[in-house]
Every structure is written in C-alpha cells, then in structure tokens.
C-alpha cells in the first residue's frame, strides 16, 4: 500500500507539473485572421499550418483568401485582418491614398507575373482597342501591365481596363469571355492558362526589372501593441518557407499544393519546382528586395504620376525591426 500511495503521489505531481508547464502556453494562444491572395506564394503558410509551426508558437491562424485587393486593404484598415500578404504596392496605396499608417514588415517574392493573352493575340499591337482585365485599376500588378504595354507602344487611351478581382477571377474571366483580351497572371494560374491554350507575351520581371511582389504588411499601431505576436508569426512563416523548399520535403510540399490549389500532380510538381528555385523562386527567408521595392515606387510615380512623378525614399513604408527579431530567434 505504501508503494501504491507513493506512486500515486508521483503521478499526481507529474500531472500537476505538466499542467503548470503547458497552461501558460495554452493561455497565451492568440487568434489571428490574415488575408492572402490564392497562389503559389502561400507555401510558407500551408507548411506552417500543416507542420504545426504556428501552433507551437501559441498561434491559431485563420487564413482568408482575398477576392480582390479592395477587400484586403479595407479589411486590414478596419481590423478584420491583422496581417495581409499581397503585392506591396497595395500598402503604398493605403499610405498615400487612404492615409492609413501601415508598415511593410516582410517580403516574399517577385510576383511571378506574366502577361497572358487570348490565343489570337500574337503581338502587343494586337491589343490596341481591346479590353484588358485587372484586379483593381490603380494598384500593384495593373501597373506592371500598363508599363509593359507602354514600352511596347500602347498608351492607356489605346485599350479599355476592366477590374474583375484576384488572379483566379482574371483567369476565369479570360476563359469564359474572349473580349477579356489580356491579364497579368501569376503562379499557378499561368500554368493553367497555358494548359487552356492562352498565349503569353512574357515575364514582367524580364521586361521591367526587379520587382517586390508579395510582402506582408500591417497597421503600425497594431504591430506596436502586438510585437511579440507579429515576431512569432513571422518566425513560423519563415520556418514554413524553409520547410517547403527543402528537397527532402518535396513529396509532402507537392501534396500541399495539390490540396490547396486543386492542381494535378504534374502541375503541382512544376509549381513547387518554380517556388523552390534558389534564385528565381520564393525569396530566401522572405526577405524584402530593396531594388524591387524601389521599382514598385517608381512604377506608381510613372504610371499614376504620384509624388509629381518622383518616388519617395522607400524607408517611410518599411519597418524591418520585427523581421530582424524574428530571424534572430530562429
């Protein structure tokens, strides 16, 4: 009986210790609602969710897919989403047009944008008098299209612009409506477009130079009050990115793309190969590309004539302090 009593007390003590150790973590579990555009760039999020990188840092992350950039920007401004990942020109638009105090805190990729066209469009000149479709007419990837068209002899007055929303909506519009002559699309929608017989007038980065596509941005006030949460989120994101592009995880990462993007295995394999390319894929550790961001500002200055055509210094839109802390803690 003495031994049973001792063993019972030991088990009780062990149970109490386990509770004492785990309770603080459980009590600190933080719910986040974020918004992203559907696409290849979400590999870090898919990995962080499936591998428990968020959970082990006390985070429960609800990932919402953006129907368009208007909802993403407005949702961030009104607190529906705490963190968003999108073309960083959206953050600049929030700061300059809506006068919202934002900070870009992390990079992601160059956008992987290509100018996709209907099969009968063989040259830029063939787009004269046609309708091009965009997410929103005055932000981000639309500027890439306008500039590619301008460099090839087409001014804004030479074509119509129709906003339809995110990449999946633009591809759908082009497949259902032949009058939707062209759109900027990114991965894996460019692969789907090719499989459906649509044409391709080339890569935006090859035509226009370095470009900061996807990045993470937040309200500065929220970040200041939730710095630890933001750092933990970024650590999980970076860990997810590292896991996703690691060759030893290729089969599992491919499955994530198959499930999340409804791709067949061949297309998912191709998508992962592009995402994990050491120089042309998702940016290592989601670093921001300074030259790419300068070009984002330059495009807004040139296309929208913002800032009287002279882009400001990038620093006013950036806060790298959270990223530095996140990386240091990995």
Regions found by a protein language model. Name each.
Residues 1-6:
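N-terminal secretory signal peptides that target proteins for export/translocation
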Residues 8-18:
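Sec-dependent signal peptide hydrophobic core
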Residues 22-27:
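Sec/Tat signal peptide C-region and signal peptidase I cleavage site
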Residues 28-173, 177, 181-187, 201-204, ...:
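Short, glycine-/small- and polar/acidic-enriched structural segments
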Residues 42, 46, 73, 88-91, ...:
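Extracytoplasmic/secreted envelope proteins and their assembly/folding machinery
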Residues 90, 169-261:
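Pocket-lining segment of extracytoplasmic ligand-binding domains
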Residues 224-308:
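Secondary-structure end/capping motifs
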Residues 297-330:
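Conserved C-terminal helix/tail region of periplasmic/extracytoplasmic solute-binding proteins
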């Amino acid at each position: 009986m003495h031994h049973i009593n001792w063993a019972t007390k030991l088990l009780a003590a062990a149970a109490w210790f386990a509770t004492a150790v785990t309770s603080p973590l459980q009590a600190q579990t933080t719910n986040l609602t974020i918004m992203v555009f559907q696409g290849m760039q979400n590999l870090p999020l898919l990995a962080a969710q499936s591998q428990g990188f968020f959970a082990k840092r006390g985070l429960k992350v609800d990932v919402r897919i953006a129907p368009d950039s208007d909802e993403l920007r407005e949702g961030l401004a009104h607190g529906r989403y705490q963190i968003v990942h999108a073309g960083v020109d959206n953050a600049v638009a929030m700061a300059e047009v809506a006068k919202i105090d934002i900070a870009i805190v992390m990079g992601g990729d160059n956008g992987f944008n290509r100018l996709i066209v209907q099969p009968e469009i063989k040259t830029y000149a063939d787009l004269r008098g046609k309708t091009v479709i965009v997410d929103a007419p005055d932000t981000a990837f639309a500027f890439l299209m306008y500039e590619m068209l301008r460099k090839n002899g087409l001014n804004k007055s030479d074509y119509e612009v129709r906003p339809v929303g995110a990449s999946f909506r633009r591809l759908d519009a082009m497949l259902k409506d032949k009058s939707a002559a062209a759109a900027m699309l990114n991965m894996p929608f460019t692969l789907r477009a090719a499989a459906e017989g649509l044409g391709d007038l080339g890569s935006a980065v090859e035509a226009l130079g370095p470009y900061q596509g996807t990045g993470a941005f937040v309200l500065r006030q929220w970040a200041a009050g939730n710095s630890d949460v933001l750092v933990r989120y970024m650590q999980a994101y970076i860990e997810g990115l590292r896991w996703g592009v690691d060759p030893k995880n290729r089969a599992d990462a491919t499955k994530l793309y198959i499930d999340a993007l409804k791709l067949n295995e061949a297309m998912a394999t191709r998508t992962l190969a592009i995402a994990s390319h050491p120089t042309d894929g998702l940016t290592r550790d989601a670093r921001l590309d300074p030259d790419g961001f300068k070009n984002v500002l330059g495009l807004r200055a040139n296309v929208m004539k913002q800032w009287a055509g002279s882009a400001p210094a990038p620093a006013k839109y950036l806060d790298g302090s959270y990223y530095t802390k996140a990386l240091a803690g990995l």
